[in-house]
Amino acid sequence: MGFNINIIGTGGTRPLHNRYLSSVLIEYNGDNFLFDCGEGTQMSLRKQKISWQKIKMICITHLHADHITGLLGIVMLMSQSGETRKDPLIIAGPVGIKNYTKNNIDMLKIYTNYEIIYKEIIIDKTEKIIYEDKTKKIEYTRLKHSIECVGYLFIEKDKPGKFNTEKAEELNIPKGPIRKTLQDGKEILINGKIIKPSEILGKSKKGLKVAYITDTGYFKELIQQIKNFNLVIIESTFKNELKKEADKKLHLTAGGAANIVKQAKVLQTGLIHFSERYTLRKDLENLLKEAKLEYPDGEIFLTKDGMRLEANKNNFIIK
């Protein structure tokens, strides 16, 4: 339970023996949300002892192979774990995600014993919120890549302040569901008097905001979308010396990624989606150095396969 982030993979293009393709799983009070699902994702999930059966929603950024080729394996395994899945699986992504998944399920005769709900995103037309419940919501944001691509914003809703029991007794508010109504942020009527939540509840606690951003070139609109986020996991595909190649392929350098989060005043930044050419630890450390040179006041770190981050007040602690 709680609010945790698991780094499933950190690479780009193809999986390496020590680095799977970029994928992140967010756990929130028993609900699991998987972002991207490249080749080998199920292997990394197994290594980290994370059950694919508990995945509520899979959000795909775009239809390039290194972000989607592991999806069908997860879909298949959910019907082969010895237990029947009770809840539907939600699969979200840009236009084409439904045809890709359904056509392959039919062609490969993949058996599924559960419902799949598709949420195709028509960029700038589809409602920004693609998932929402009482405690959280997920929004998409347009990215700048060679094909239609989106980033995802996982937003924890503000938590109500502490319930003032003494004040409730003073106002003759009976125990039970009516107090819960106030805690849910709704007004109540007692003896002809309207009582607002603000009269009973203390100051609310701001929810945490997490963004998953890959693949994209630099563009100003993104800065506003992730303004003041608690954590942004963002691609850092190339070293600064390869900026021309990054710009051509619509990817980010380490310095480019840091420049975006610096302008957005992001509290914590995790670098991800490392080029396959960077196989040595010192190569990755150089990416980190370049990012920190651009944003020396920011808290920037390298994500690593198997890393786990746990929410702690206004930030996340690496475990």
Curated annotation (Swiss-Prot):
Disulfide cross-links: none
Gene3D superfamilies, per database record: Ribonuclease Z/Hydroxyacylglutathione hydrolase-like
Binding residue positions for Zn(2+) 2: 66-67, 215, 273
Cofactor, free-text remark: Binds 2 Zn(2+) ions.
InterPro entries: Metallo-B-lactamas (IPR001279), RibonucZ/Hydroxyglut_hydro (IPR036866), RNase_Z/BN (IPR013471)
EC number annotated for this UniProt entry: 3.1.26.11
Keyword entries, A-Z: Endonuclease, Hydrolase, Metal-binding, Nuclease, tRNA processing, Zinc
Cofactor section: Zn(2+)
Record's catalysed reaction(s): Endonucleolytic cleavage of RNA, removing extra 3' nucleotides from tRNA precursor, generating 3' termini of tRNAs. A 3'-hydroxy group is left at the tRNA terminus and a 5'-phosphoryl group is left at the trailer molecule
Domain of life assignment: Bacteria
Keyword field contains Transmembrane helix: no
GO molecular function: 3'-tRNA processing endoribonuclease activity; zinc ion binding
CDD domains, per the entry: RNaseZ_ZiPD-like_MBL-fold (cd07717)
Keyword tRNA processing found: yes
Active-site residue list: 66
Ligand binding (Zn(2+) 1): 62, 64, 145, 215
Role summary: Zinc phosphodiesterase, which displays some tRNA 3'-processing endonuclease activity. Probably involved in tRNA maturation, by removing a 3'-trailer from precursor tRNA.
Family: Belongs to the RNase Z family.
Subunit structure: Homodimer.
Name of the protein: Ribonuclease Z
Organism: Borreliella afzelii (strain PKo) (Borrelia afzelii)
